[in-house]
Amino acid sequence: TINHLLENTGKENILFVKCDDERVEEDNLIESAREKHREMFDPQDTTYLFLDEIQEIEDWNKTIKRIYDLDEKTKIFISGSRLLKSELSTALAGRFVYFDVYPFSFKEFLKTKNVDIKGRTDLLSKKSNVKHHLREYLQWGGFPEIVLEKDEEKKKELLKFYSDSILYRDVIKRSGINKPEKVEKLKSYLLSNFTNLLNYNKIAKHLSVSPDTVSSYIHHMEESYFVFSVPMFSYSIKKQQINPKKIYCIDNGIRNSVGFKFSRDLGRLYENTVFLELNRRYDEIYYWRDNGKEVDFLIKEGDTVKKLVQVCYDVSSAGEREEKSLIQGMDEFDLKEGTIITGDTRDKLEREGKTIHYLPLWEWLSV
């Protein structure tokens, strides 16, 4: 955003403040930075104020409201935890626009590697290169600093830092949790069981806490975008609420940083990656299960089920089972087409009057 502004705006009209910089000990960091900026540059036109990790500033929402109300020439850009949204809603009701920013998608990842895809034909010609980068993406994830870092030991250090920062700053500190060791243990449990169904009673026993406490901890983790839970689809809200949810992680790199074997979990990393991409594209994501058949992802728009997506890394061992589940789901929701995301199988099959598209993950993510 800043680079884009610099194309048409003088740098004297842009102020960036890193609010979690431990070297700065100002009582009112934001106003102090604005005052020093005015003294040094005396900006005459609109000033663009960027505030990073603003949640570290006490009573920041009051400061932002005051600037917004009294200074029409200042445009404010805030970045930080997802938890800011509710506080902004209180301070600036109806006067702000909110964007979720995720780690790089695979398309964005490829751009950083100077791999430019111009249509499906071009993609197929670059298949080997794209598959090579997909393996790196599955292992290290999409956080920009990790993607740009070449040293693997530094990548590991950064991933641990990100994981700890989200957990302690955005979950434990902001939520006032007084048993951080329980949250740390829960984090390890969730990351080792990602893509699986959650059993709150089992987790509660594992942590020696109540199921309600487990629910509260996971809720805080979801608010910080550390994990996402996906409910089972049902037209009955009660059934949705009583059935277990599936858990996914914000980034494969963070998930892998806890020390699990990459190759052993490749199928689940595929599923996590598919979820993250669907989460960028759609607002309502569920899984579906009925009579022993399960479909990984169900996409709903309004009152209508629009898509069913199955993930099957190894079609040779599980493809028939996944296909039968998908067909049953398509029958249930009167869908003519369904998709199975695979390791490297590409096909189009007609089954019982329905079309099943088999697409390898590297292709599905890139088009």
Model feature map: region roles:
Residues 1-9, 216-220, 225-226, 230-367:
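A cross-kingdom feature that marks ATP-driven nucleic-acid transaction machinery
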Residues 41-60:
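Conserved P-loop NTPase "ATPase switch" module shared by AAA+ and STAND
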Residues 75-81, 100:
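Structural recognition of the conserved hydrophobic beta-strand(s) that form the central parallel beta-sheet
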Residues 83-98, 113-114:
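Short regulatory helix/loop adjacent to the ATP-binding pocket of P-loop NTPases
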Residues 107, 111-277, 284-291:
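Interdomain hinge/linker elements that couple catalytic modules in large macromolecular machines
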Residues 15-44:
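Short glycine-rich substrate-engagement loop in P-loop NTPases that contacts/grips substrate
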Residues 55-77:
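Conserved Walker B catalytic segment
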Residues 97-107:
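Conserved AAA+ ATPase "SRH/arginine-finger" region at the nucleotide-binding site
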